[in-house]
């Protein structure tokens, strides 16, 4: 789990969600694979399901495009899921989060 993913997971747990890491590492290809090619974390709580893609703030637009092009994206929305981007950045020496809901 990357540092940014760990930050998002900790934040969601603090907000009262149950959170699962849904990306995995393929040791043969030495690459990470997201759920449906676009989701890093899946959270449930407060009567909702939230799919989260975690990145740095500078890559938000690329990740937004990646999610919107994913075959599973329309079905996530039809299923009532919230799909959210977490873009982390440092301000001074404190981490800040920019959250974008799709």
Write out the residue ranges for each language-model feature:
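Catalytic phosphate/metal-binding cores of nucleic-acid and nucleotide-processing enzymes, i.e., regions
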Residues: 1-102
